[in-house]
Regions:
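Glycine-rich phosphate-binding loops of nucleotide-dependent enzymes
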Residues: 1-290
Length: 290
């Protein structure tokens, strides 16, 4: 279109796309115009600093790899596709150990979603076995997998990560509301405890919301919705963290934050399974790539 002498307005926060496509960039932050620069006269790092108000590191700092025992074992697993009425994943086997980040990479639509659905219990397996910390979880429920030490940052935060019409504090205890800390013996929610727990996570994980724990999830930005999910899943102190496209649609500041949280889990001796389509993420974050 530009070659045909037509004007194009591109709205994006993908730094690669911006640097590749645009001729001139205007940066907005918190509703204000920060500045306009010629793309040829700036860098991705410079644009990122304008966008978030500070320097952002694109390099993921990790300590030396010290893998421990096996946490997740997937043996000859087959998962069906509801869309194509065939097996999207056929006889897949792999393991994830403590203290490492393992990445499943590939072009979208090649079985990653079905693989994760089978792993987390969202869809049943056609065949194969799953073991978490040596225990067979092949046919266990989603709640059971969660209480056994599996956390899941889902691909679609609106469909599987949050209840958008719930408050932030209610979303923070979606998988733990039945615990004695949050529900009394008569079955009533301990609202004071839930509020205190949510306030702690909001502060600890820098989740920004207009009304704190009573903020409705649908009113939050995508980045802060994702931070809330990350806070909830990591605070469960999981043995295995399954993170599926955890930085999709996020700005560079939120991406940096998510990467640091994944690496922190790895450095604490947790097992992390990362599923992503982002090439930079594939090359920078994991210790092994499948």
């Amino acid at each position: 279109l530009a070659a045909e002498v037509k004007g194009c307005l591109l709205i994006s926060h993908n730094r690669i796309e911006i640097m590749w496509v645009s001729d001139r960039v205007t940066v907005l932050r918190k509703g204000k115009c920060i500045g306009t620069v010629e793309t040829a006269n700036t860098t991705a790092e410079g644009l990122s600093a304008m966008r978030v108000g500070r320097n952002v590191s694109f390099h993921v700092e990790k300590g030396p790899l010290k893998p421990g025992g096996e946490v997740l074992s997937v043996e000859h697993r087959t998962v069906a596709s509801k869309v194509h009425k065939n097996n999207a994943v056929k006889k897949v086997s792999f393991q994830v150990r403590r203290g490492e980040i393992v990445c499943i990479a590939g072009i979208d639509g090649n079985g990653q979603t079905e693989l994760v659905y089978g792993l987390t219990g969202l869809e049943p397996l056609v065949s194969g076995e799953l073991f978490l910390c040596g225990q067979d979880i092949t046919h266990t429920s989603i709640r059971k997998r969660s209480t056994m030490g599996m956390s899941h940052i889902p691909e679609d935060r609106h469909k599987h990560g949050l209840v958008l019409d719930y408050s932030l504090e209610d979303n923070m205890v979606l998988q733990r509301y039945f615990e004695p800390e949050f529900t009394d013996k008569a079955g009533f929610l301990r609202r004071k405890n839930i509020r205190g727990y949510a306030e702690r996570l909001i502060e600890q994980y820098d989740v920004r919301s207009g009304q704190g724990p009573v903020t409705m999830a649908h009113s939050m930005s995508g980045g802060n919705q994702q931070k809330a999910i990350v806070a909830r899943e990591i605070d469960k102190d999981p043995e295995l963290l399954v993170a599926v496209q955890p930085t999709r649609g996020l700005d560079v500041g939120a991406i940096e934050y998510i990467h640091r949280q994944l690496v922190a889990q790895r450095d604490e001796g947790k097992a992390v399974l990362l599923v992503t389509l982002e090439l930079d993420e594939v090359m920078d974050v994991p210790d092994r790539i499948l």
